[in-house]
């Protein structure tokens, strides 16, 4: 009997340690709830530390809103031990974030962070709709993602299609002679030659793009690398697969990028884009339909057509294996601009 009671008390203690309020789905959050004077005052006076400005901050000296998980924000990493929920890249999970209040150095600190950028988005949007500072941690999530006919590289099925039908050893071999023509005096020169050739010789296929957007499109209509060379046109994925094939033939590892783009007015993901990155002297450079290389930190800050910006990038290393080509997930790179836009939304919300 004592053993049962002891187990029950341990269960209660563990439940209390990890207790949090119900999971909020930001798709069902209304703009905006009435907020308490305390919450409004806190947000207006608190210092907001995001991955954009965390490098110059070494300690908490006033009421603070910490934005971003420990891998993105060094100040979050320093103080994560103070929080009940130890957020990381895998917990609470994809598209999930947390809101948690703690007292650190005598100051109120609110952590708004996600396992990924979509989780951070969920935590900020949910926090903006609270009517008071939460006493217990909140886990929130969003289904703010777009699956345009599953043409995102994050789809295992779509990657499998590319590996078996587009970037096959046989198809890569067909553009080998072109790769040799573009080979430069060193790795960087070769990459620059490939970027220039693709940008100058391949035109964007707007008709195919319209078909994709309308849904009147099948995967089989994507080009193989040799088809892109022959027709001299393609959409972003066609550019990316051709570029990857040319790089592979010159023994350069390409990284195909799955780029999630968000609308700056709604801050919601609206589409996905494909491009390629290469690594030169431990720095990633992006090749994206332009005759030059773009450092990835500059690329993540770009604004695209229709006022779209990068929410996040998932990198897939393209490798040759015995049985063919594999796209292996390398890492996720958060967009730079989205942090600023989310904080602007938060400040606008509480300055009204």
From Swiss-Prot:
Name listed for the protein in its UniProt record: UPF0252 protein MJ1282
Q: Which domain of life is it from?
A: Archaea
Native species: Methanocaldococcus jannaschii (strain ATCC 43067 / DSM 2661 / JAL-1 / JCM 10045 / NBRC 100440)
UniProt record similarity statement: Belongs to the UPF0252 family.
User: Taxonomic classification, please?
Assistant: Archaea, Methanobacteriati, Methanobacteriota, Methanomada group, Methanococci
Q: Where are the transmembrane segments?
A: none
